[in-house]
From Swiss-Prot:
Pfam families: PRK. Its EC number is 2.7.1.48. Transmembrane segments: none annotated. Pathway: Pyrimidine metabolism; CTP biosynthesis via salvage pathway; CTP from cytidine: step 1/3; Pyrimidine metabolism; UMP biosynthesis via salvage pathway; UMP from uridine: step 1/1. Keywords: Acetylation, ATP-binding, Kinase, Nucleotide-binding, Phosphoprotein, Transferase. Residues 1-24, 236-261 are annotated as: Disordered. One of its GO terms (molecular function) is cytidine kinase activity. According to PubMed:8812458; testis-specific. According to PubMed:11306702, placenta-specific. Homotetramer. This is Uridine-cytidine kinase 2.
């Protein structure tokens, strides 16, 4: 399928007169959001494309953590700062950046250092693309941001799986110890998921149980994106229906999967 997708993307004209198609991807911590996005990009044949010419790009909400004060940074280094709260993100910059993307502008994305809990001086340049995937635990929390997405995906993975993934990730990639990870999870991550992330699941057009392992759902999404890129009949028709999947069928599929809590 990847080969066919790559050929399709190479031949298409930019949809809707150049306006990019924004897709929001939400879900709990370590639910597989970035893996789902990476799988979509892979199946669309974009992995080997030069970054200046990519037609599908991924942005992460994690890049937009606020610059912390000295006091906040000291708490963060002890695992006592809540990075899962909406106020932890620079929401004004997120909104400004996404609006500029919808206008077809080249944007500069911050780079966040999860070891030192600080924003680096360098930025990443993102050039105009046809499809932009924006993933994050609170991607749907702000209505202003949420309303910019033409398609909204929620990655629904059970709590035990998410916790085990987070432990492995934070130890190997972020230099944390197990005690700190578990304390932070119980104190901040789990309560924030239940209060801020899980309630936004209702805004999703498509719910993806089991994340990147759910190839059936991902292939349907890829097919829909291909239709959008080619200006097909399903272009921008995502609210309530995706390739024949109605809202009621969507909910039934999500209810049959494991709930996070």
């Amino acid at each position: 399928m990847a080969g066919d997708s790559e050929q399709t993307l190479q031949n298409h004209q930019q949809p809707n007169g150049g306006e990019p198609f924004l897709i929001g991807v939400s879900g709990g911590t370590a639910s597989g959001k970035s893996s789902v996005c990476a799988k979509i990009v892979q199946l669309l044949g974009q992995n080997e494309v030069d970054y200046r010419q990519k037609q599908v790009v991924i942005l992460s909400q994690d890049s937009f953590y606020r610059v912390l004060t000295s006091e906040q940074k000291a708490k963060a280094l002890k695992g006592q700062f809540n990075f899962d709260h909406p106020d932890a993100f620079d929401n004004e910059l997120i909104l400004k950046t996404l609006k500029e993307i919808t206008e077809g502008k080249t944007v500069q994305i911050p780079v966040y250092d999860f070891v030192s809990h600080s924003r680096k001086e360098e930025t990443v340049t993102v050039y105009p693309a046809d499809v932009v995937l924006f993933e994050g635990i609170l991607a749907f929390y702000s209505q202003e941001v949420r309303d910019l997405f033409q398609m909204k995906l929620f990655v629904d993975t059970d709590a035990d799986t998410r916790l085990s993934r987070r432990v492995l990730r934070d130890i190997s990639e972020r230099g944390r110890d197990l005690e700190q990870i578990l304390s932070q999870y119980i104190t901040f991550v789990k309560p924030a998921f239940e209060e801020f992330c899980l309630p936004t699941k209702k805004y999703a057009d498509v719910i993806i149980p089991r994340g990147a392992d759910n190839l059936v759902a991902i292939n349907l999404i890829v097919q829909h994106i291909q239709d959008i890129l080619n200006g097909g009949p399903s272009k921008r028709q995502t609210n309530g229906c995706l390739n024949g999947y109605t809202p009621s069928r969507k909910r039934q599929a999500s209810e049959s999967s494991s709930r996070p809590h």
